[in-house]
From Swiss-Prot:
This is Protein argonaute 2. The keyword Protein biosynthesis does not apply. It comes from Oryza sativa subsp. japonica (Rice). Probably involved in the RNA silencing pathway. May bind to short RNAs such as microRNAs (miRNAs) or short interfering RNAs (siRNAs), and represses the translation of mRNAs which are complementary to them. Residues 391-504 form the PAZ domain. It comes from the Eukaryota. One of its GO terms (biological process) is regulatory ncRNA-mediated gene silencing. The gene is AGO2. Residues 172-187 have a biased composition (Low complexity). Residues 1-201 are annotated as: Disordered. Residues 18-125 have a biased composition (Gly residues). The keyword Ion transport does not apply. Belongs to the argonaute family. Ago subfamily. CDD domains: PAZ_argonaute_like (cd02846), Piwi_ago-like (cd04657). One of its GO terms (molecular function) is RNA binding.
Length: 1034
């Protein structure tokens, strides 16, 4: 129960007295104590005592220069081992040995500093060895021993609820050593290519732009000190448990440590990432410390790792650890009075109410990066919804309609409340405490029926009686469930809802916003480019803006508050190929600045044939929202025929259903199969079904699953009330016709060979790849990988392959097999294999470039290359999840209607990577909000693209997206891969919806994420053979 009790375990360490040695001569501070005993599980030295203390965190440690000496380990020669917590090790000549878990000398001839063991040997020892730095010195008197405990009593010290004491490793019952470094991906032979030239020069016009990048100023001569801080519960303390410590626990313990007089002078000059990395502008005392915070005791190891000179920021490539260290410092210097969510910093002083229990906070998204103009901080405007702080009971009353405290909640109400409250942070109001809890869930029973066994008396007590007797609280809403605030499985902590309060600063799920709140939030977020620029500048110049305050001053960093200015270029659009009619030439030139075109009196490049089609109308019983069927059929047939699609004017089947059918997977299958069989009875093959719906419905997922994996029917779903509208109806029908033609094998728009520089002289293929991951709260569902490939000369027809793979696996498994299949389709259609392949990869971070080159590309080459077939390959990564924005510098320069840069705006100097081959391209006409350019990286190029050629190729590929008559924001191969992966996600969710609900016992033991219990990705459905090579996903 909430009055938690518990006992810690006892640990025993065995040690035998070791040899004695003096303090370090000619060293810094001698040591922390006299030479002495063995470490945990260790034994005393076997060799003769050395001259000086080795560096360790137990008696015998120190920084003296001199021979081995004392301290926990096994010295087999020269002066004995210098044991100590995790590293220890003498720094003089000789030594080696084994300390607590690891150890090892640092001197020539000594063992290496190792993980789990040191070991003797020559210079360097094992793989973790570091060179020795000691030199011989005369023995010196041992320093006085440190006090056993030091209570903070200095009048100038901050108030503390605990104690900090330095301890020896022999006093630690159990502290696990740090895990060895783990590589993110397999190391390979390939690295991302460097920029081949100074950037492109081709353009319609050059434009002056402002970019939301701000120069970070720092002192070149400064040095940052990197420490590893390891915080664990002391299991010998009464409140010890096996629970994993939270980030809040780490921060609390770190703050308590820096109230101690040994650390307090640097309390305003420290940056901590909340995990293992701590950065300061001066040296810290290192060693083991026992820190007491309230009723818990922690063991804290502070170990020096490395000096990081900021002068290295001007080197190329910039050392990763220096950039990571400065990133932590900048985050710390930007967090004053802020709520931090990921890379976002939100100010409570800039809140706007958008609903009864939700506010929107304005803030920034910040990213530190190196560019050609130096170290910059990218600052973007951001809006995030947050819950209002207050009683949990208020939230319950708003979430549950017709709440009656005299009756229990029904299942629907209970599920609604669980979804609202799970994961929320609360505090209790029946006792004076600042302790915070995370809601694990709700009890199945109401508070009036909950009992527990008292740990002291062994008697069964009612929960309500406990709160009445212990705290004098009479629970009014006895029929409501309790919040489960348990921190471990063996200690239940159920608290009545009315005794809990929501903490401030908690993110509100966007999916839970009502329609009005969602609309208001979008209006705040999707502001015009000029307004976004002003918001960013206001946030950067604010008193609590980035890189402000004492921490920034201590580290000597500041921010130039002016946006960076760069020169961009506007690329010319390509010539497009349309269909011919009435003697029209097939070549079509775009002359509009916004690069849009219309299809009035024009035909599609290749019209498909739609002979057998039908209508399954789910809106038939929806009253005023029901489809006007006759009008729709007349309009869509006429539009398709005008555009060159050979469409039968009469449907072969029409079925009138209601929306409820979508909620029953079995009935839905029967109705759809009935349509297929009706066509078969007429000796026809059903190609496409129109499926109007009166509203968005989850059954859409099941419909796609059934038609595309079981029946082999393509579908075109749409909202009936939009098709009925007279205003804009012609454009709506045109948009439907574009999708229909693509699905039935037609081609809407094509590129000429001249629009594909350096590859059009031989058969070529564009491949796009992406991985769709489950939502953040989902811990079991598989990730969905999709690969698409072009199979025609006009780069407009694509074939997909979709696979499920393990949960959150980013590397595309079986990429080689999928590419081999796609090349086989290409060869079947063109009677030749592609000799040139352009591989576009979406959704990977900078740190995963090695994975793309040395895992995915290697898998592809292994599968497709043979003695007789070896195509050349270019690898391009497309990134949309960044916060760089481009703004026209002058209001009078040419721009879109809402102030965005024109389509085709490219930037490849100044704000790009100082070494990589990258560029920003804004290829679309942003109609709402501020346009986000796509950031392209070329990782490998076997075709020798110059910057102009590559930028032209990528931009031109944005014009062949089948669903619209304008360039899109992402190269079409990548866009299609994203759509195909999302379609695979719909299949999986539809499959979960079609399964019978689990039993109560099974559901109680399963995870609460969507799709729980169905993480076996091998059961993912395969596409129907009739659709496997079609563009059904557009």
């Amino acid at each position: 129960m909430e009055h938690e009790r518990g006992g810690g375990g006892r640990g025993r360490g065995r040690g035998r007295g070791g040899g004695r040695g003096g303090g370090g001569g000619d060293g810094r501070g001698g040591g922390y104590g006299g030479a002495g005993g063995g470490g945990v599980g260790g034994r005393g030295g076997r060799g003769p005592p050395g001259g000086g203390g080795g560096r360790g965190y137990e008696p015998g440690g120190g920084r003296g220069y001199g021979g081995g000496g004392g301290g926990g380990g096994r010295g087999y020669g020269g002066g004995g081992g210098g044991g100590g917590y995790e590293s220890g090790g003498g720094r003089g000549y000789g030594g080696g040995g084994r300390g607590y878990e690891s150890g090892g000398g640092r001197g020539p001839g000594g063992g290496g500093r190792g993980h789990e063991s040191g070991g003797g040997g020559g210079r360097g020892g094992n793989v973790w060895a570091q060179p020795g730095r000691g030199r011989g010195g005369a023995p010196a008197p041992a320093p006085a021993p440190a006090p056993a405990a030091r209570r903070i009593q200095d009048e100038g010290a901050a108030r503390s609820s605990g104690t900090v004491e330095r301890i020896a490793s022999t006093e630690v019952v159990r502290v696990q050593p740090p895990a060895p470094p783990v590589a993110v991906s397999r190391s390979g032979t390939r690295v991302p290519m460097r920029r081949p030239d100074g950037g492109g020069s081709v353009s319609k016009a050059k434009v002056k732009l402002l970019v939301n990048h701000f120069i970070v100023k720092y002192r070149q001569a400064s040095t940052v000190f990197h420490y590893d801080i390891d915080i664990k519960l002391d299991i010998s303390s009464p409140k010890a448990s096996d629970k994993e410590l939270s980030k809040g626990d780490f921060l609390t313990v770190k703050d308590e440590l820096f109230k101690d007089e040994s650390f307090r002078r640097l309390s305003s000059a420290v940056a901590y990432d909340g995990k293992r990395n701590l950065f300061t502008c001066a040296e810290l005392p290192d060693g083991l410390f026992r820190v007491k915070v309230r009723s818990r005791t922690y063991i804290v190891s502070v170990e020096f790792k490395k000096k990081l000179p900021l002068s290295q920021l001007s080197e190329l490539p910039v050392p990763r650890e220096v950039l990571q260290g400065l990133d932590v410092i900048v985050r710390e210097a930007s967090s004053w009075r802020k709520i931090i969510i990921g890379q976002g910093f939100y100010s409570q002083g800039r809140s706007v109410p958008i609903g009864p229990d939700v506010v929107a906070l304005k803030g920034t998204q910040q990213t530190l990066k190196c560019t050609q103009k130096g170290l910059i901080l990218c600052v973007d405007y951001s809006v995030m919804p947050f819950r209002k702080a207050g009683p949990v009971l208020d939230l319950v009353q708003k979430s549950v309609r017709y709440l009656d405290y005299r009756t229990t909640l029904n299942k629907h109400q209970l599920d609604t409340l669980k979804n609202e409250l799970k994961g929320q942070r609360v505090t209790v109001n029946h006792r004076r405490t600042k302790q915070k809890y995370i809601v694990k869930g709700l009890t199945d029973k109401p508070a009036s029926q909950i009992t527990f066994v008292d740990s002291e008396s062994g008697q069964t007590k009612k929960l309500l009686d406990y709160y009445s007797q212990q705290y004098g609280k009479v629970i009014e809403y006895q029929m409501l469930p309790c919040l489960d605030l348990s921190k471990s499985k063996d200690k239940q902590n159920y608290v009545p809802i009315e005794l809990c309060d929501l903490l401030e600063g908690q993110r509100y799920p966007k999916a839970s916003l009502n329609r009005n709140s969602d609309k208001t939030l979008k209006e705040m977020a999707l502001i015009p480019a000029s307004s976004r620029k002003e918001e960013i500048l206001e946030l950067v110049n604010a008193d609590d803006g980035p890189c402000r305050g004492e921490i920034a001053q201590q580290f000597g960093i500041s921010l130039d508050v002016q946006m960076m200015e760069v020169t961009g270029r506007t690329l010319p659009p390509p010539s497009l190929k349309l269909g011919t009619s009435s003697g029209q030439p097939p070549k079509f030139n775009i002359d509009q600045p916004n690069c849009q075109w219309n299809l009035t009196r024009k035909r599609l490049a290749e019209g498909g044939v739609l002979q057998c089609w039908g209508v399954v109308d789910f809106s038939a019983d929806s009253g005023q929202y029901a489809l006007n069927g006759n009008m729709f059929i007349d309009k869509i047939v006429r539009k398709c025929c005008d555009l060159g699609v050979q469409m039968n004017r009469n449907p072969c089947i029409v079925q009138l259903l209601d929306m409820e059918v979508l909620s029953d997977p079995h009935q839905l299958f029967e109705e759809l199969n009935k349509a297929k069989q009706a066509a078969a009875s007429k000796k026809q093959k059903l190609q496409l079904l129109f499926c109007p719906m009166s509203d968005q419905h989850p059954g859409y997922k099941t419909l796609k699953l059934i038609c595309e994996t079981q029946l082999g029917i393509q579908t075109q779903c749409f909202l009936s009330f939009l098709a009925n509208k007279q205003q804009g109806q012609d454009q709506y029908m045109s948009n439907l016709a574009l999708k229909i033609n693509g699905k039935i094998g037609g081609s809407n728009i094509q590129l000429f060979g001249e629009s594909l520089p350096r590859i059009s002289g031989a058969p070529y293929m564009f491949i796009g790849a992406d991985v769709n991951h489950p939502s953040p709260g989902n811990v079991e569902s598989p990730s969905i990988a999709a690969v698409v490939a072009s199979v025609d000369q006009g780069a407009s027809k694509y074939v997909p392959r979709i696979r499920a793979q393990p949960h959150r696996c980013e590397v595309i498994q079986h990429l080689g097999d999928m590419c081999k299949e796609l090349i086989g389709v290409f060869e079947k259609r063109n009677r030749v294999k592609p000799q040139r392949i352009i591989y576009f990869r979406d959704g990977v971070s900078d740190g995963q470039f090695d994975m793309v080159l040395n895992e995915e590309l290697a898998d592809m080459e292994k599968a497709i290359k043979t003695k007789d077939y070896s195509p050349t390959i270019t690898v391009i990564v497309a990134k949309k999840r960044h916060h760089t924005r481009l703004f026209p510098k002058d209001l009078n320069q040419q721009q879109t209607k809402n102030g965005n840069v024109l389509p085709g705006t490219v930037v490849d100097t100044g704000v790009v990577d100082p070494a990589a081959y990258d560029f920003y391209l804004c290829s679309h006409n942003g109609l709402i909000g501020t346009s986000r350019p796509t950031h392209y990286y070329s990782l490998l190029d076997e075709h020798g693209f110059a910057s102009d050629d590559l930028q032209k190729l990528v931009y031109n590929l944005c014009f062949v997206f089948a669903r619209c008559t304008k360039p899109v924001s992402l190269a079409t191969p990548v866009y299609y891969a994203d759509l195909a992966a999302y379609r695979g996600r719909l299949y999986y969710e539809g499959m979960m919806m079609s399964q019978p609900p689990p039993s109560s016992a099974a559901s109680a033991s399963s995870a609460s994420s969507s799709g729980a219990g169905a993480s076996d990705f091998r059961s993912f459905p395969a596409l129907h053979e009739d659709l496997v090579d079609n563009m059904f996903f557009i």
